[in-house]
A protein has these predicted regions:
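One-carbon transfer enzymes
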Residues: 1-179
Length: 179
């Protein structure tokens, strides 16, 4: 079996999505297409995240990572839409036979997008599912004394309710920082 054909969706230049793409590429997986959401809410989320990690290094921009691929003779389509749930996305991905869609830090996405790829849609969630759902999972983990971690799961029309593929907890101790 070869490597899956997949589309990668992220909020425009969000550090989480940039790092996730860097990690995916480092493992030898290259998306067929990248679809960035350029929206005011996405901008707000990106700025909040950057403030949280202020001063720490972030992965190269999407354009830089794509240029590095292009220098190796690998071209990846990069489209920008105003919202991933929009009518704009389905025509873009229906042009490509996809095995998977990978969410790299998106807002909640529902509907036809979830049903299109042959093998499903995968999300990396910053919390241990099913105990800690939603975008502020690390904070809720601390507040409710739930271990901090990450979950990779298939997506369905619920919020962080799809089949769990992998859970990994990260021990966190008083005084630790993002570094």
């Amino acid at each position: 079996m070869g490597k899956p054909a997949f589309a990668y969706l992220l909020l425009k230049e969000h550090p989480y999505g940039r790092e996730m793409l860097r990690q995916i590429l480092s493992e030898g997986f290259v998306p067929s297409m990248i679809i960035s959401e350029d929206s005011p809410i996405g901008d707000e989320e990106r700025e909040k995240f950057l403030k949280r990690i202020e001063g720490l290094p972030v992965a190269p921009t999407i354009d830089f990572q794509l240029q590095e691929l292009s220098n190796k003779g690998i071209d990846v389509i990069h489209e920008t839409v105003s919202i991933h749930n929009s009518e704009q996305v389905m025509p873009l991905i229906k042009d490509i036979e996809l095995d998977l869609i990978v969410f790299g830090g998106t807002r909640i996405i529902r509907g036809e997008i979830l049903d299109y790829p042959r093998d499903g849609v995968i999300n990396s969630h910053p919390g241990l599912l099913p105990d800690c759902r939603g975008s502020a999972s690390p904070a809720w983990s601390v507040y409710h004394d739930i271990p901090i971690g990450s979950t990779t799961h298939f997506c369905d029309n619920g919020i962080d309710t799809g089949e769990i593929l992998l859970r990994r907890d990260f021990p966190v101790h008083r005084g630790m920082t993002y570094e």
